[in-house]
């Protein structure tokens, strides 16, 4: 199943703590999805009153830095597996008070996504277009980045290359 990493950072004297690579209330606890999310270890609140921020990211990894976590999309996304492996999801639930309920973390896709439509025209009839061997390449795209796990910002790094999109 899919795996996400969860960090939990407690508030101190009512003020949000700062996410760190280690030393948080919980550091990068793997949660695996089957029919529901299952943590690799039991997780408990610090006490009955201390609020916490919950940080979630996908896919699960072993970040040595939470402010510049390296991630690379596949330049060849022609297969569904490579396309899906190029997705990065991040989310936060801020200021959560201790509760016996599950903590809900809203997540977002932080990498770019593009939908390309090709259609007949300019010398192509529907029939000739359908018979043509058409390929698409997206040029001048940086496929490497760092993700700041504390705020979800992404910074492109490295050289630009060509990406073959999923069809």
Regions found by a protein language model. Give the residues of each.
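Short, low-hydrophobicity acidic/polar segments
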Residues: 1-141, 162-167
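Intrinsically disordered, low-complexity terminal/linker regions enriched in Pro/Ser/Gly
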Residues: 146-167
């Amino acid at each position: 199943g899919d795996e996400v990493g969860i960090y939990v950072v407690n508030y101190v004297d009512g003020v949000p703590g700062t996410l760190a690579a280690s030393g948080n209330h919980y550091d990068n606890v793997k949660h695996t999805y089957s029919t529901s999310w299952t943590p690799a270890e039991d997780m408990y609140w610090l006490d009955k009153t201390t609020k916490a921020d919950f940080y979630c990211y996908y896919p699960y990894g072993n970040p040595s830095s939470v402010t510049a976590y390296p991630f690379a999309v596949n330049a060849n996304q022609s297969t569904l597996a490579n396309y899906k492996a190029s997705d990065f999801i991040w989310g936060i639930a801020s200021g959560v008070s201790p509760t016996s309920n599950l903590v809900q973390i809203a997540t977002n896709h932080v990498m770019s996504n593009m939908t390309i439509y090709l259609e007949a025209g300019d010398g192509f009839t529907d029939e000739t277009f359908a018979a043509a061997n058409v390929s698409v390449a997206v040029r001048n795209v940086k496929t490497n980045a760092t993700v700041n796990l504390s705020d979800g910002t992404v910074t492109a790094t490295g050289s630009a290359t060509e990406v073959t999109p999923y069809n």
